[in-house]
A protein has these predicted regions:
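OB-fold/S1-family single-stranded nucleic acid-binding modules
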Residues: 113-134
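Conserved hydrophobic positions within beta-strands
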Residues: 56-58, 94
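Short, conserved beta-turn/loop elements at beta-strand boundaries and strand-helix junctions
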Residues: 62-67, 115
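Short nucleic-acid-contacting surface segments enriched for D/E, G, S/T with interspersed K/R
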Residues: 96-109
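Residues immediately within or flanking Cys/His clusters that coordinate Zn2+
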Residues: 16-19, 33
């Protein structure tokens, strides 16, 4: 079970694809980083908030046929690595698409959707998933 306070603290990254960008080398990171692993010491205090692009293309994907019991209702489902239009790789579930029609290079966009809930009367967790951008 998770806390409501923790959920609210994570909202920028979870709901809006908030990452960071190194002003020293220009690298973009998602999820956000506190320092640039490429620049190391030279990148300290040069990492700023960055809004990762919400559109991109499927870079790689997999269709999940066997899943944990908590995901039984949505089997089979697809997860994808999406390369956003600004070059960031984001892993997420791919929804609202026929599983047989998913292709590498397919244009997609991020949307806010329900991820899960802590029991029937618990906290509902929302986050990003990707849908076809037709």
């Amino acid at each position: 079970m998770s806390s409501v306070a923790r959920e609210w603290r994570e909202i920028p990254g979870r709901y809006n694809l908030k990452g960071t960008k190194c002003e020293n080398c220009g690298s973009i990171f998602f999820p956000a980083r506190d320092f640039c692993p490429k620049c190391r010491r030279a990148g300290i205090r040069k990492v700023v908030p960055y809004n990762v692009c919400r559109t991109g293309k499927v870079y790689s994907f997999s269709v999940i046929h066997e899943a944990p019991d908590c995901n039984n209702a949505m089997k089979p489902y697809a997860v994808a690595m999406v390369q956003t239009d600004d070059g960031v790789l984001v892993s997420a579930q791919l929804v609202d698409v026929d599983l047989d029609k998913i292709e590498i290079g397919m244009p997609v966009r991020a949307v806010l959707r329900k991820l899960d809930a802590d029991g029937a009367s618990g906290v509902i967790h929302y986050g990003y998933k990707f849908v076809p951008n037709l």
